[in-house]
Amino acid sequence: VYLPHFKRCIEEGAASVMGAYNKVYGEQASESKYLLKDILRDKWGFEGFTLSDFLWAVKDGPKAVKSGMNVEMPCICHYAEQIPKAIEDGTLAMEDVDEAVGYILRTVLYYETRKDPQEYTEDILACPEHIAVAKRAAEESMVLLKNENHVLPLDKEKTEKIVVLGVLGDTENIGDHGSSKVHPYYTVTPFKGLMKKMPKAQILYNDGSDLEHAKELAADADAVVIVAGYIHSDEGEYLADRSDIAGMGGDRASMRLHQRDIDLIHGVKGVNPNTVVSIIGSSAILIDEWEKDVPAIIFSFYSGMEGGNVLADILFGDVCPSGKLPYTVALSEDSYPDFDPDCTYAEYEYYHGYCKMDKENIPVLYPFGYGLSYTTFDISEPTVEVFDKTAKISVNVKNTGDVKGAEVVQLYIGCEGSAVDRPVK
């Protein structure tokens, strides 16, 4: 469940791998021989170098080196303090250090000889191939959660006036500004994406701060798109003990939308039957308090440089949504583990996420793997071929609707009557 997507990155030639902060099987991930050597090196054949996540991923420097962690980031805190003494007293072999240095030098020399320019111009960043990848990523990830009375897709011939509401409706919003920050050559906002999609229509933008005015605009439009959610200062990298940046980034203070977004949705509810809410965020957002007030909801996540264009394509049916929820949208905060945005240590038990909710029969609003489409599919009964250590499970998928689309085939496995405590699926 957790390793295949990392394995695919290695198979595609990833040159470095970062260890995480969390523990796996009781060990720090950045000090785990099982992860860093047994799986990454021996099983997958990785030949690049490994580095730790920043500041707190490594606790025991010598153990990390022996386990296959080559570089401590962002400074050599534990390595500088602990490694010389460990070599001196014989608890760390010089061969382990040499091995780590070897992986680093080999990777650096390989890329140095390729003369990578390091600075990338528009013809590289915004080349047709990169734009196509950005569009595909957004197209396949957006999730259509609700489409009451088939509000979507909107009719191009009948849509002459669209109102985009919300602070994020015309904000270039691609997510975290920490180590995962990217610098695309351009970013298309929802408002600009709709303007490009419908050049002959009247497209209006309003941040929604004046609820009465927003309501008037919504009532007079053929369709309303409310863009709600988060930006990097709401959820991103954050140091819990840094008072000078308290309140910026890190874990969200709430699992719900900002009150301004909730007020906007409540404020315009009922005035336009063609209202769509596009939600931007990285993980589960509770929507139960307003979900019934709007006919259509799309989880857009942080959809990258082409996000606004893709949202417009989905709204007007040029792209058929096929994304599925990578988490469960619960009915309340009580369905999740205790939540403390300022904690420096948290322990999650074996069951969390959708596995916990399944195990405890907790009702949810939208389950893990949920996502609507503009078409319908028929999936045949599976056929199973059992081999020595593997099994091949096959199904036939048929598009039974009138719209070209794609379906994500999901396979869940359970162990009924198992003597070992296991997830339901």
Name the predicted role of every residue range.
Residues V1-D96, Y103:
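Second-shell residues forming the walls of enzyme active-site clefts
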Residues L3-P4, G26-A29, G45, L51-F54, ...:
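C-terminal non-catalytic regions of proteins with extracellular/luminal or membrane-system context
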Residues I10, V108-D116, K324, I362:
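Proline-centered turn/helix-capping motifs that create local helix->coil transitions or kinks
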Residues A15-M18, L40-R41, G61-K63, P117-Q118, ...:
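A short alpha-helix capping/helix-coil boundary motif
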Residues E81, E95-G102, R106-I124:
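Conserved, charged catalytic cores of large soluble enzymes
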